[in-house]
Amino acid sequence: MANQNINNDVAKKEKTYWEQAIYDARKYGVNLNGMVVCLDNGHGKATKGKGSPWSLHKVEPAIPLREYEFTRKVTAKLKELLEAMGAYVYMVCPEVEGDTSLSARAARANNLKNTYKKTGKKAYFVFVSVHADAIGDGTKWMPGSNGWAVWTTKGQNVSDTFADCVWEAANETFTPMGMRMRQQKANDGDPDYEADFTVIKKANMPAILTENFFYTDPTDCEFINTERGVEAIAVAHAKGIGKFAQRRYGFKTRDSYTRPVDPGLLLEKENS
């Protein structure tokens, strides 16, 4: 029996970071059954200038990164985590080619919410637009301009609470990893930056836009170019969404896996 216990302990220690994250989400995470998360992976392949100095101009150090590829890696991992927690996840922009407009992205999420509302069933909708940040014209690395940040629209509303929760989870995740957290000067009491970005301004639900480090800073870019970096970003978002569901809507943690709610809706593909 003693040997069996030792073997079990060894097996637990051998879980990868991601395997442990999925296990924790299913075993200890907030039960998000009844939550619909609209995930927007920022930008498309055709969006110009969205890449590291190496990817755009072969400026060393040789750290390749394209924002559209990075955001799709993050949202794919985040979808997996959120579904493990019981949420229904709607991928706002599954297409890669082209550059789907910001208004179209918000409209897709709004259409899903409006269509579901007509069924008379209850669900809580949130919108998350995932990006990476940059500074300069992309022709050189800009060390020192770095860190993680979250944005909401101007003024105080429920999205500020959402942003607070995700910022807290990101801080808990990234600070121990030695990564910088950014926040606005505390003139309105919360850490999020504010701007009326179209994609979150037009989303008719609590909506945030996250800037997941700078691909123009070598240290940040190297971090988000790794599997561990992508996974940590997904974990931070999932924990933050769970915090918001608890704080705002009274969702509870759970002891066992719950299958995700499926609104049972198929939206026709929209023209971008």
For each predicted feature, which ranges?
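Active-site-adjacent mobile loop/cap segments within catalytic or ligand-binding domains
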Residues: 35-40, 116, 136, 182-272
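Active-site histidine-acidic residue metal-binding/catalytic motifs
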Residues: 6-108, 136, 144-146, 266-270
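Active-site-adjacent substrate-binding region
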Residues: 159-190
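Mature extracellular/periplasmic domains of secretome proteins
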Residues: 26, 102-123, 159, 197-203
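Solvent-exposed loop/turn segments at secondary-structure junctions
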Residues: 43-46, 89, 95-99, 132-138, ...
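Loop/turn elements at helix/coil->beta-strand transitions in domains of secreted/extracellular proteins
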Residues: 33-35, 82-90, 119-127, 173-177, ...
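Extracytoplasmic/secreted envelope proteins and their assembly/folding machinery
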Residues: 72-79, 103-106, 147, 160-167, ...
